[in-house]
Design a protein with these regions (language model features):
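An acidic/histidine-cluster motif and surrounding catalytic segment
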Residues: 1-91, 102-134
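Conserved ATP-binding N-box helix of the HATPase_c
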Residues: 99
Length: 134
């Protein structure tokens, strides 16, 4: 897992949520391995496959809250598969969960492309925040 600046991450999540007219509530990240995320996927979603992120949404209309499980194993294999750095893929998956809490879906027709656009825009926000801190 990359070294994470918690205050920068909070600022980033807040900026992304604000772009959707949302404020931050309680958000928990659970970093796990493939075995654990498969267990969660089976138990709660009745899906029998590995995934990179599972989001449980407890949000209210203008305040996002939830539990976000991230498989660090799948993040690593995704990064290798798409030719991205581990760090970039980690942050993409990290914000993917937040985007779900903000109401962005990725299962229906055309939704995957919309999610990817928001992921890219969110990663640009993070890149700009990091550049300003240097």
């Amino acid at each position: 897992m990359p070294r994470v600046d918690k205050s920068l991450m909070h600022e980033w999540i807040e900026a992304v949520a604000r772009g959707f007219g949302k404020s931050l509530g309680d958000i928990s990240y659970i970093f796990c391995n493939d075995a654990k995320i498969l267990e969660v996927n089976r138990q709660f979603l009745n899906h029998d496959y590995f995934t990179d992120v599972i989001t449980f949404d407890y949000s209210r209309p203008h305040r996002i809250s939830g539990d976000i499980f991230i498989s660090l194993d799948t993040v690593a294999s995704n990064a290798e598969m798409v030719g991205a750095t581990y760090e970039r893929e980690f942050y993409r998956v990290f914000i993917h969960g937040i985007l779900h809490l903000c109401g962005v879906n990725d299962k229906g027709p055309g939704e995957r492309e919309i999610m990817e656009r928001y992921e890219d825009e969110s990663l640009d926000i993070l890149t700009n925040m990091i550049a300003r801190k240097k």
